[in-house]
């Protein structure tokens, strides 16, 4: 039986997807060792948007990843890893030291949990190439040409002011070109404050078609008088169906461009 999706249509694999974000070197101690006890690390690569691109590619979807990495062995290895998983990397920018002073690839250390011990992540991503690149050099109209779907998250704009501008500009260009846009707020408290995240991510909402989650966004009861509160205030962490539905309806009333939450 064929199922029709109102966003994808009946042939989702005919869609061309592009995502944008930071890809990082992932270092993991083998055999569930703790980082402080490790004498060796297994190397791989990851990042929220890169993982989305990889997952889509593994499902047979035409998937492209856009990012900035240093033009050295680490950056080239990250690109090779993506390509080995059938992710297109044609738009990727490999930078020289005169373009991004630190010219480094972000890194994170993953301590894999075992039993009741939770996993642990340590990030070392400040001054990575993507946070220092001048994106005014990028022709976003040309970058998004030929794609049907753009996926972004709230992680990338939290990295640096230049990334914030990039994400908002990409959303505006994608909307103008008629791409379907999905956005995952994906709040990270180690990167910015709750209010900073809410302020920026709310700016993104007019350009989004598919919204993943209802935070971090402002949904003011009165746009001109914020003292009246947010429609989400007082909603429990485990809301009833009726409570969820009311919030969804409020979002759609405020942002009729939203096709799916």
Question: What are the functions of these language-model segments?
Answer:
Residues 173-180, 255-259:
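A short helix->loop->beta-strand "cap" motif at the edges of active sites that frequently abuts
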Residues 36-46:
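Short pre-catalytic strand/loop immediately N-terminal to key active-site residues, enriched for Gly-Thr
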Residues 1-35:
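Positively charged, low-complexity intrinsically disordered leader regions
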Residues 51-62, 84:
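Alpha-helix C-terminal capping segments
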Residues 166-178, 200-207:
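Catalytic-core regions built around general acid/base machinery
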Residues 126, 155, 186-190, 216-217:
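Active-site beta-loop-alpha junctions enriched in small/polar residues
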Residues 62, 66-154:
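Conserved N-terminal subdomain of the carbohydrate kinase-like
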């Amino acid at each position: 039986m064929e199922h029709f999706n109102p966003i994808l249509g009946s042939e989702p694999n005919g869609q061309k997807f592009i995502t944008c974000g930071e890809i990082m070197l992932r270092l993991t101690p083998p055999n569930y060792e703790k980082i402080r006890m490790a004498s060796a690390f297994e190397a791989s690569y990851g990042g929220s948007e890169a993982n989305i691109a990889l997952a889509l590619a593994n499902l047979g979807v035409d998937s492209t990843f856009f990012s900035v990495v240093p033009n050295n062995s680490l950056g080239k290895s990250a690109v090779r890893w993506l390509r080995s998983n059938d992710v297109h990397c044609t738009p990727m920018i490999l930078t020289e030291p005169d373009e991004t002073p630190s010219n480094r690839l972000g890194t994170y250390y993953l301590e894999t949990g075992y039993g009741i011990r939770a996993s642990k992540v340590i990030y070392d991503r400040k001054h990575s190439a993507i946070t220092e690149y001048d994106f005014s050099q990028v022709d976003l109209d040309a970058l998004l040409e030929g794609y049907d779907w753009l996926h972004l998250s709230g992680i990338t704009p939290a990295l640096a002011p230049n990334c914030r501008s990039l994400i908002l500009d990409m959303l505006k260009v994608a909307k103008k070109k008629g791409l379907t846009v999905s956005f995952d707020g994906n709040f990270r408290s180690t990167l910015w404050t709750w209010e900073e995240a809410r302020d920026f991510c709310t700016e993104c909402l007019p350009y989004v078609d598919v919204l993943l989650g209802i935070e971090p966004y402002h949904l003011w009861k009165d746009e001109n008088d914020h003292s009246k509160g947010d429609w989400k205030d007082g909603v429990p962490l485990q809301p009833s169906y009726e409570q969820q539905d009311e919030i969804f309806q409020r979002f759609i009333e405020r942002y009729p461009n939203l096709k799916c939450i």
